[in-house]
Amino acid sequence: MKTITLSELPTGQATRLSPSSIVVSTTPSEALDIDANRRLLNRYRFVQHEGMRILAGWLPRVATFELKCEMSRTLWEDALHVNALYLRLREIQSPAFQKPTDDALVTAMNEMLHAPDEFGLFLALYRVLTPSLIAALVSHETATFPNSDLPSVHAIKHALLDLRGQLERLEPLLAEAERAGKISEAARSWETYIRELVAFAGGVSGLEKRSARPPAPPACRVEFKVPLEAKRDERFTNLAADLEQMPGEDDYDGHTVEEFERYSTEMLAAETVGLVMFLVPSMPWEFQFDTARHLYDEVRHCLMGYEWMRGHDMNPFTSPQYLHIFKWRSQFPPVMQYCMLTMGNEVHAFPYRHRRVEAHQKSGDVLSEQFVRYDIADETQHVRFGKRWLPELIKQSGDKRSLEQYTEDALKVWHEQYRTGKLTINVE
């Protein structure tokens, strides 16, 4: 490929061209043809799409708080990348989403789910898979037609920005875990196994030299089981507390402390969204895209609580975690979990949130006011998600009730148990 410089243009033409008008001359034999292009884009899409579901399923099982937050952000950012690739792929292939024909890549992604522990998962993801994806995207960015395929280049450039940021944020956390002796031999064996699987697939691109034979699964492999309980790391000291009556709203200071302490526990909502997302893989892509955003919104709300508490010299790790709420929700079908969360928790919070905005304004507490207003904006969107997707979730579940009847029945359970704190948890 040869770049056309201004000096090479006919006299006077350079002054008539904007920078966006200057394109690169491309020799067809040097660039990816459109068939190779779409196969590669679909591989990248598949890797990140499958990665989203893996992260969603693992979220409740991961104990380390910082890793929970980062994996949630990765999931959301990966959803943005998959969506950009979806918009491009639907223009150059039909259907837009296709299972890759390379069984080696499919196997590598299937196996990612069965890591022995959270550190095995993160080593495999952030030290093997993501670096391989970055290498593939870097190569693709300059290998395709820079003008004819600019939509792909645009998507790749933005994905690279996020993916590099993920590694920059995660590597210090993994290094800290190594120094603390938290990374087991099983986790390291898992990293090696996934590295060998990816090598057998020729890397994420499939264009690298492939190893001669696939590795055998290591003894550390643990068949993934859907998590029905949420985990927290050793810094959390109050895991099973019951929800208590908050100080009255007329006690502004006391109530506000409890208000933001409750925000700090919204990881529970993110974990429920992740569980729902994992359990309904047949839902349309747009549902997965919306739930990825919903999930990370709840993590941001949790972090909002942490920020507020630390700013007021409080330790968020001593806050009650109410883990039994996740356990209670997880015993219901995913559609009911989603209904109770969006039509119960989210809808019924608005009158209270608006009162809190007014209270913070009257007290001159700008930070608290702004935090709650952003929360209201997010939760308004979550209710829209619920109204959009509950009909399809009910349909796919095979339930014959109408949306109205299903919602009424789900909210009856929510009011009788969640609102009263009398949670009935079935123990098998």
Where are these regions (language model features)?
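Non-heme di-metal
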Residues: 2-428
